[in-house]
């Protein structure tokens, strides 16, 4: 026993010997006696000390991203991963490992027949609400606001109801990664209304699916007002079989997707076989950046419908709309396009099979653009007026969708300069790295998307499926000219990539906080890393994925700076920022946001940007 004890003592002392924190190496462990030295965090400490030169300061920032799993939990989940059994324990795994996962919302047979008011609610499954409900109203106010990874499911809601009203006000505002499902909502309902107001405003990565919504409804009105206003980058909304077989149902989309960034809408079999439908799209996609809208079999085989597109995609930047089999085989349908597609920079509109096989239809195009394509459409009953041969902005560079301060010139990094700070706040869900012992056993390739979906309970066409697919494809994208890249799901993998590019004498830096975001700040003391010389570095940016995943890459010919950021009035230090300047932009695209903002072209100027919250930069140690 004495020999065993003598053997273990120096081994354990090595486990406790050094920990990284606050830029220094701490002896005597750095752990409290209660912390197990076999945890993933302790393992990361040892790996850093093994791989990084002993004179390089440690990084409490990187250590904070380490897995919170206990030693026992880490070993348990690693074993489950090797046996492909993690899906059976996913909720436990997500909770213990601090992952980003959607809850599994299963259907329920519980019924709710009375009026309901939901205020300040979150993450619910609504099944059989308002079924066969005469009159009354349900109100959702300030529901799922300021949430993270919000998912709500509405199934068989207001089905067969009469005169029942539903109000969604301030729903899922300012939330991050939102998925809402409306299935068989208002089906076969008579009268009443559904009102969506200030719905998903300011949301990051919104997804809403309306399936069989108001199907076979009679005189039921739906209003979408200020829907996904100022939302950012997501699949947007999908309307499938919306109002199909409906009778006299007015639908209004007002201020829908206004000032949003890269948001899509998909209308499939919308109003099909409907009678006397009245749909109005007013101020739809206005001031948006690259909106994508797809209308497929919209109003097909309908009777006496009226569709109005007013100020649709007005003042938007680029964007694309596709109308396929729109109003096909319909009867006496009236469609009016007014100020359609008056984008600042031209997008494209495709009308295929438009009004084909229809009788007695009247379709007016007033003020539409040069990039409109009309293919296989009806030759009668269609009127074209004021065809715009040039876009509103004449194709000029527009910087309204590039946030002020997001890119700047190197000359701005001088003490005393006033500079606009962009919003550097991290918009991603909070997650942790997985230990290498687990992440190495998980599938991660486009050929194994089905396996990844199984692990993380991602259904077909779900938000999680899109998140997984987008991340994997971006990671497998070939590097750009002179770029070296790798996606990493563990801190150990990040250390390996950084040291493979820069060597083992490296320093990891990040911007200290988000203080000064979206405000003017004053540049304080500036320090050029590596003497301010042109050098190489590794930058790592978060990707949206269930576990913490970073896209790390290195490009040649950069300068890296650290600078104090001061309050312009008091001159007090409020932040310490890290900036990287790309000295060679010749391989960048001409439509890159930097050139829109700074007014130049690839290869003619250098471009600088800040390292945002929770992103990081590795550089060779001075």
Curated annotation (Swiss-Prot):
GO cellular component terms attached to this protein's record: apoplast
Pfam family, one: BURP
This protein's UniProt keywords: Apoplast, Cell wall, Glycoprotein, Repeat, Secreted, Signal
Expression sites by tissue: Expressed in flowers and stems.
Sequence ranges assigned to domain BURP in this UniProt record: 407-621
Location (main, coarse): secreted
Subcellular location: Secreted, Extracellular space, Apoplast; Secreted, Cell wall
Its job: Involved in cell size determination.
Record note on domains: The BURP domain located at the C-terminus has not been identified in non-plant proteins.
Name recorded for this polypeptide: Polygalacturonase 1 beta-like protein 1
Naturally occurring in which organism (per UniProt): Arabidopsis thaliana
């Amino acid at each position: 026993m004495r020999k065993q004890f003598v053997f273990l003592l120096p081994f354990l002392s090595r486990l406790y010997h050094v920990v990284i924190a606050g830029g220094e190496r701490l002896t005597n462990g750095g752990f409290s006696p209660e912390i197990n030295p076999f945890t993933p965090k302790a393992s990361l400490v040892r790996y850093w000390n093994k791989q990084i030169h002993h004179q390089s300061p440690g990084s409490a920032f990187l250590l904070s991203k380490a897995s919170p799993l206990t030693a026992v939990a880490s070993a348990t989940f690693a074993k489950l991963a090797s046996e492909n059994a993690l899906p059976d324990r996913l909720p436990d795994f997500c909770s213990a490992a601090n992952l980003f996962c959607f809850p599994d919302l299963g259907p329920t047979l519980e019924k709710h027949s009375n009026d309901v008011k939901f205020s300040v609610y979150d993450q619910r499954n609504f099944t059989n609400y308002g079924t066969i409900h005469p009159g009354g109203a349900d109100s959702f106010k300030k529901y799922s606001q300021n949430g993270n990874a919000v998912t709500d499911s509405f199934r068989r809601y207001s089905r067969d109801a009469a005169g029942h009203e539903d109000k969604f006000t301030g729903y899922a505002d300012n939330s991050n990664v939102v998925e809402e499902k409306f299935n068989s909502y208002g089906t076969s309902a008579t009268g009443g209304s559904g009102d969506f107001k200030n719905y998903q405003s300011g949301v990051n990565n919104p997804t809403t699916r309306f399936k069989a919504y108001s199907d076979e409804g009679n005189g039921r009105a739906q209003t979408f007002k200020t829907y996904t206003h100022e939302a950012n980058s997501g699949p947007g909304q999908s309307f499938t079989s919306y109002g199909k077989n409906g009778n006299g149902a007015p639908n209004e989309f007002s201020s829908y997707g206004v000032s949003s960034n890269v948001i899509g809408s998909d209308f499939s079999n919308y109003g099909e076989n409907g009678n006397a439908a009245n749909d109005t799209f007013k101020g739809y996609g206005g001031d948006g950046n690259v909106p994508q809208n797809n209308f497929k079999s919209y109003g097909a085989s309908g009777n006496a419908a009226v569709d109005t597109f007013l100020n649709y995609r007005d003042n938007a930047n680029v964007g694309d709309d596709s109308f396929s089999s729109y109003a096909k085989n319909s009867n006496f349908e009236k469609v009016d396009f007014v100020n359609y597609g008056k984008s600042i920079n031209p997008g494209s509109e495709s009308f295929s099979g438009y009004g084909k096989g229809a009788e007695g239809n009247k379709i007016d195009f007033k003020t539409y653009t040069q990039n409109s394509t009309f293919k296989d459409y009806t030759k009668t009953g269609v009127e074209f007026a004021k065809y715009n041969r040039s876009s509103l902005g004449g194709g000029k560079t527009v910087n309204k969708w590039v946030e002020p301060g997001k890119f700047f010139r190197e000359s701005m990094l001088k003490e005393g300069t006033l500079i606009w700070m962009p919003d550097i706040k991290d918009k991603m869900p909070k997650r942790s790295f997985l230990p290498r012992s687990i992440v190495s056993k998980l599938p991660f390739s486009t050929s194994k998307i089905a396996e990844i979906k199984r692990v993380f309970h991602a259904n077909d066409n779900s938000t999680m499926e899109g998140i997984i697919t987008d991340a994997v494809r971006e990671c497998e994208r070939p590097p750009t000219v002179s770029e070296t890249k790798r996606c990493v799901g563990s801190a150990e993998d990040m250390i390996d990539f950084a040291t493979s590019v820069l060597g083992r004498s490296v320093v990891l830096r990040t911007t200290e906080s988000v203080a000064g975001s979206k405000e003017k700040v004053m540049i304080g003391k500036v320090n050029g890393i590596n003497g301010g010389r042109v050098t190489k570095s590794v930058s790592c940016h978060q990707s949206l994925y269930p576990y913490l995943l970073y896209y790390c890459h290195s490009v040649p010919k950069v300068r890296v700076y650290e600078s104090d950021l001061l309050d312009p009035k008091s001159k007090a230090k409020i932040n310490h920022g890290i900036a990287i300047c790309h000295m060679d932009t010749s391989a960048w695209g001409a439509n890159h946001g930097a050139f829109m903002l700074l007014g130049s072209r690839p290869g003619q100027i250098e471009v600088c940007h800040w390292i945002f919250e929770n992103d990081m930069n590795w550089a060779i140690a001075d």
